[in-house]
Amino acid sequence: MIVDCAHYVGGVRRHEGPLGIEEAASCARERAGFVWLGLHDPDPGELDEVGRAFGLHELAIEDARESHQRPKIEDYDGSFFVVMKTARYDDEREEVEFGEINLFLGPDFLIAVRHGIGSGLATARRQFEARPDLVRIGPAAAAWSIVDRVVDDYEPVAAGLENDITEVEDQVFAEAIGHDTTTQRIYFLKREVIEFHRAVQPLIAPLESLVAGTIIELDDAIVRFYRDVADHATRVDDQLNDQRDLLEGVLQANLSLIGLRQNEVVRSISAWAAIIAVPTFIASVYGMNFDDMPELGWG
């Protein structure tokens, strides 16, 4: 489904309403300005139509169709295919939801394909359109507005995970009694942190390559914006590494407390077994049928 499609010339949007795919491709071929096409969960036929209209590489189209790709940037004969993971923290369920954005970046176009939950791309477009200086730079600046939005949205997710980790840490050390349910929650949090790390970490190297100009030569005016995004992604990645280490420590502490609790139970059972063993032994001996027991006459 087309969410929005616009042709930008001279730093401004030329059309109020969204363009069709063929009309957008025709505008891109004019070599005046550029086209930004946004799609949300397109069907295979729609993606194929976009691919034909803009001359996109079939392998990139295949990746966009299947989704669930690792974050990456690939060069296809002068146009670039970018994969990013979107993330959103669900406060009610205390879970992280993931989606995906694929970008096709060419000299005269930017095509954004969103699968599942996504960042506020409509907001990113409005903010971009409010900056004619950025619009004049072209598709690379439009792509930055999306990448920046996606990475900005990582921060509240990391903060939500941080709160969950603090809660489970307080639960473990405040009660000083290990619980199997707590162990399950720690494992769940570890899995979410690892999955989030897999979304963030692979994005850092391509962003740094963009800044260094080894993938594509960017306008100097936009390089500093990409550098800021790369720094932001690195900070989030460092935070996730710290969270993973902290969760490992909390897990080991909880398992140790469970072990101590089990030892206490075993010692308690052993003590009661020893107490019960004495009268049981006496009763078992004197309950036997002996013809001669001399000690019964002592005293």
Label every PLM stretch briefly.
Residues 1-221, 225-242:
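Peripheral, non-transmembrane regulatory/ligand-interaction domains of membrane transport proteins
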Residues 231-299:
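Hydrophobic alpha-helical transmembrane segments and their immediately adjacent juxtamembrane loops
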